[in-house]
C-alpha cells in the first residue's frame, strides 16, 4: 500500500478512524493484482493474499452482537465491539496456497477478518487452536511452566490442566488468522502460534495500521504484559 503521512490518519481510535481505514484499504484492494498460484510458486512458500476488490462487509447491530456473544460465550471489549459495529469482516475469502502431501503447492481459500455470523467453524477452530497449540508444545517441546503446578504424568491430565489454565485466563478473541484480541485488560492484539506469543498491536488502532496500512504513525506506549493472567508469562 502507498506510504501515507501520519497527519492523514485520524489520531484516535473511533468511528472516523475506522471509516478512514475502510476507505483506505478498499481503495488499495481495488488496485491490487489478483493473486494466483504462480505467485506463491515463485516465492516458494505458502500463505494467503487479499483478492482484488476485497471489501468490508459493514457493521453488526447491537442485537446481532448480543446474539454472537451468547452463542460463543464471549464478551467483546469496547474497541473490538466498535470495530465489529463499523467494519466487522472482509469478503471475499482470501486466496491461499499450501503444500499437499506430495509437497506440491495447491490453491485454497480462508477467511480474512473473521465474519462472526458466517465463519463459525473457523472461529471455533481458532478458539480450539489456542489450547491445541499449547498442548503441542507441552508434548513435543518440553513446555511446562512452574506456575502451572506439578506436571501430570498422564497426557489427559496435562490436557485438562492446560484447558483449566486457559479457561481461567482472559479470553483470546479471534480477529484475523492467528491474531487474537485480549478480551480483558489492555486491548492488546496478540499473534499466537503454539506457545510463541507476541504483541502484534499495542491497541486495536496500532494493530490495524500495522496489519493493513503501510504508514508512518506514532505508536502507543509499550504495554507491560507481565501482569496479564497466564498469558503474561508466555508473551515474548
Regions found by a protein language model. Give the residues of each.
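A surface-exposed partner-binding patch
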Residues: 2-167, 173, 177
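Short alpha-helical interface patches
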Residues: 62-70, 204-215, 236
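Short, well-ordered loop/turn elements at secondary-structure boundaries
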Residues: 167-171, 176, 184-186, 193-194
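Low-complexity, glycine/alanine/valine/leucine- and proline-rich hydrophobic stretches
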Residues: 183-215
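Low-complexity, Gly/Ser/Thr/Pro-rich intrinsically disordered linker/tail segments
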Residues: 220-236
Amino acid at each position: 500500500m502507498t506510504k501515507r503521512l501520519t497527519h492523514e490518519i485520524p489520531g484516535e481510535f473511533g468511528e472516523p478512524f475506522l471509516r478512514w481505514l475502510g476507505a483506505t484499504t478498499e481503495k488499495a484492494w481495488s488496485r491490487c493484482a489478483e493473486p494466483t498460484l504462480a505467485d506463491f510458486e515463485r516465492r516458494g512458500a505458502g500463505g494467503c493474499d487479499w483478492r482484488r476488490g476485497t471489501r468490508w462487509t459493514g457493521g453488526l447491530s447491537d442485537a446481532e452482537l448480543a446474539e454472537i456473544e451468547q452463542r460463543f460465550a464471549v464478551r467483546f471489549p469496547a474497541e473490538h465491539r466498535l470495530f465489529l459495529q463499523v467494519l466487522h469482516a472482509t469478503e471475499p475469502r482470501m486466496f491461499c496456497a499450501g503444500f499437499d502431501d506430495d509437497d506440491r503447492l495447491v490453491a485454497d481459500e480462508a477467511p480474512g477478518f473473521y465474519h462472526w455470523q458466517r465463519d463459525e467453524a473457523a472461529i471455533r477452530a481458532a478458539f480450539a487452536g489456542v489450547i491445541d497449540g499449547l498442548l503441542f508444545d507441552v508434548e513435543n517441546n518440553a513446555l511446562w511452566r512452574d506456575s502451572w503446578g506439578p506436571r501430570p504424568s498422564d497426557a489427559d491430565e496435562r490436557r485438562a490442566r492446560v484447558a483449566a489454565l486457559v479457561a481461567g485466563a482472559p479470553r483470546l478473541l479471534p480477529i484475523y488468522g492467528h491474531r487474537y484480541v485480549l478480551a480483558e485488560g489492555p486491548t492488546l492484539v496478540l499473534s499466537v502460534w503454539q506457545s510463541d506469543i507476541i504483541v502484534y498491536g499495542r491497541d486495536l488502532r496500532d494493530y490495524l495500521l500495522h496489519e493493513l496500512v503501510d504508514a508512518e504513525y506514532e505508536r502507543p506506549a509499550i504495554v507491560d504484559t507481565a501482569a496479564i493472567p497466564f498469558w503474561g508469562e508466555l508473551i515474548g
